[in-house]
Regions:
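The feature primarily captures lumenal catalytic ectodomains
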Residues: 1-408
Length: 408
């Protein structure tokens, strides 16, 4: 019979959370805890979206405050058992617990950085910041990402990836200050840390209006919306510079975002960095590219970081997905009604009053969908929502020759 731990004697004395409810107005600094002789343990073969990793106190109790969260309802770590004593390495000194190191750009900004705010709220010297790795091959990606972070923020982070079992003299564990979904709003300390430590002495680019495009190196099926190349042409005629963020250093990205007056683009992770600028004078427009709350949540993040004139532009039309899939959301691609988007952008001051845009014709849509079909190696069929199933349809009616069906 398993005995339930006495949580009144572990961490801050509270029961483990089933959800992580982060109030963007509620300070977290008072909830920082210190664990003596803490053991950090990640299961060696565990890697990916959720890893088996726990922090234990000197009585071998798992510390609930060290659980990492992706979103309000989804954890990034799952419990594991206390490691064998002879496999634990000693790591002297006092360290800050950073949570999970995840190498994807957006998750790095929103999750990996989510406890660094505590660096401004501890009054004792530390050796550095400890992270559990999401993937076992982490040396190159960690060096690259933390190096890029140092291009845009001071000071550089002295980090250590815990790919073995370690016992530290003292581990400072702050609450997680941000994440994805609702957690994008971040705690007050997290927002202050980002905006305070962000470098702001970059040389202006001369590009006042920027469109952050997804037509470059994004080869993931459903990463774009139909006709994005056409939208780029329309915006270039309005004076916008088409910017492929993934082709630029973080320093150059921030240089563009800090010197622009207007930034437009489909919802995606580059807007986290845009929002980190916290510029009250910046005009931000996030174009919804697929059903869901992403665009609105990105705008809410803009607002709490101090960007007052930020808007979500939701003008989706029809949607298609890959035949054979049980859930359309996995590979869904949508049309954006350019005529409605044009009206909205004019009203918000993002384009000139004389602009007149037309929706894509069915011929253009079919051309775009055919490229999607070849990329997905599956027929493209219309769907009426993210939960629609196309499992009753063969992947390809004509084997090896993906087609487009504008209607079923």
């Amino acid at each position: 019979m398993k005995i339930k731990p006495d949580y009144s004697k572990i961490g801050n004395g509270k029961e483990p959370q089933l959800t992580y409810d982060l109030d963007p107005k509620e300070p977290l600094a008072g909830d920082i805890i210190t664990v003596k002789n803490a053991v950090l343990a990640k299961t060696p073969r565990s890697q990916g979206w959720r890893i088996a990793a726990s922090v234990f106190d000197e009585d071998r109790n798992a510390v609930p405050e060290a659980v990492c969260w992706i979103s309000r309802q989804q954890t990034a770590t799952k419990p594991r058992t206390y490691p064998r004593e002879n496999r634990i390495k000693e790591l002297p000194g006092t360290w800050l617990y950073g949570g999970r190191f995840f190498p994807a750009f957006g998750h790095f900004l929103c999750e990996t950085l989510s406890r660094l705010w505590a660096l401004d709220h501890i009054d004792e010297p530390i050796e550095g910041v400890l992270f559990f790795p999401a993937y076992n091959e982490h040396e190159e990606s960690a060096a690259q990402l933390f190096g890029q972070l140092a291009e845009i923020m001071d000071p550089a982070i002295n980090y250590k990836i815990c790919d073995e079992f370690y016992r530290v003299d003292k581990l400072i564990i702050p609450p997680q200050g941000s994440g994805v979904g609702r957690l994008l709003l971040s705690s007050p300390e997290m927002r202050e840390y980002i905006t305070t430590h962000l470098k702001r002495d970059f040389k202006p680019t001369g590009h006042d209006k920027i469109y952050i495009s997804r037509t470059g190196q994004f080869d993931k099926v459903s990463s774009r919306f139909l006709g994005e190349k056409r939208l780029e042409e329309l915006l270039e005629a309005e004076g916008y510079f088409v910017f492929h963020a993934q082709d630029h250093s973080w320093e150059d990205q921030m240089r563009h975002y800090q010197s622009a007056t207007h930034i437009l683009g489909p919802d995606g992770s580059p807007f986290h960095m845009v929002n980190f600028t916290g510029r009250a004078d910046l005009n931000v427009g996030v174009i919804q590219r697929r059903p869901g709350p992403d665009a609105v949540q990105m705008v809410h993040q803009s607002n709490v970081y101090g960007i007052e004139n930020a808007h979500a532009f939701a003008h989706l039309g029809r949607a298609w997905s890959s035949a054979g899939d049980r859930r359309a959301a996995l590979k869904m691609v949508c049309e954006v009604k350019f005529s409605d988007l044009c009206k909205d952008l004019k009203e918000r001051g993002f384009i000139s009053k004389k602009a007149k845009w037309r929706d894509l014709t069915d011929t253009k849509i079919k051309q775009a969908l055919l490229a999607q079909a070849k990329s997905a190696e599956a027929d493209q069929r219309p769907v009426d929502g993210v939960d629609a199933s196309l499992s009753d349809f063969p992947v390809c009616v004509k084997e090896g020759k993906p087609q487009v069906f504008l209607t079923n």
